Amino acid sequence: MAVLTEKENFMRMFKGEIPEWIPRYTLGPVRGLEGVAPAVGVVAPEMLSAHRRRGGGKDIWGVEYITSKEAAGGLLPKTWDFILDDVTKWRDVIKAPSLDDIDWEMACKKDLEACGVDRSKTALASMAASGYFQTLMAFMGFTEGLCALYDEPEACHELFDYLSDFYCTIIENTIDYYKPDLFNIVDDTAAWGNPFVSLEMFREYFLPLYDREAKFARDRGIPICYHNCGKCEIFIDDMVKIGVDSWNPAQICNDLDAVQEKYGNKLMLCGCWDPVKITDPKLTDEDIYDYLQKIANDRAKNGGFCFLATILIPDEGDSRMLHVNDVVNKAIYEIGHNFYK
């Protein structure tokens, strides 16, 4: 019998099938797994991702992204130089670049080459918008951005519609050239302890925007993956209704038992672990292995679960964390490949 690729094994779960082994979903390259084909890779338009590829700088809106040791290489908006201080004046500041003269076929070909995904082994996920909530916070910062949602709903709706028109034009012109296996919707609308917005505000502002994007995937039968960190379980029902098939990183601050009981294999959970826990210097290698085994036992017995256990190492010279990462990689492989035998 032919051996499944990582892609084939992962994509089985979108059909409600139990995979041959527990897949590993990653949000980027994983140290120690450079020679292993990832289950998923991402393609995004150059104009939207150029600042990330070059490790920082200004995005298309003028927001400057920087990295730091504390962010473990992640890019975040510069927190002392926001570009918008009054949402009612967004038209004076937020200027979408023209899309009129783009050769979409050629642009998509270049994007696919740049992402370096071997589609025979790895599922391709496409994405455009990096989240409407996140984008507003990047423009204004959390204090002014959250106040704007409460104080200036008309201006916020107008800004979001403007952004949505821009992003959906890009999706409309790229999706049939990319021909992705998966479609990503990304927005971090929650902190660890609570959502940043109420369910009512989520439905008023953000759900219609996600639904508009999701329709491109629904119309083509493309599975939809939803990324939202933090305690965002209150939004999951609505996201499933618009077609979401997978949620990452499904962090443990959520009631994951209740989510799995309700949706079973209909909603794949990718993650479900506590990366802070395994950085405890008192833990042995066996403790880490046992923790990951427990996650598999709790989440994977009926399928619908994917490991997303990746440690971002802020200090390349931190031998302890380098070792922990190696232990995690080995444990996930061994546990995952033996779980359904």
Predicted features, each with a name:
Residues 19, 30-35, 63, 70:
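Short helix-loop boundary/capping segments at the starts of domains
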Residues 40-58:
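Short acidic, Pro/Gly- and aromatic-enriched capping/linker segments at domain boundaries
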Residues 24-45:
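Short, basic/low-complexity N-terminal boundary segments at the transition from targeting/disordered tails
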Residues 54-102, 117-125:
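A contiguous, low-structure linker/loop signature
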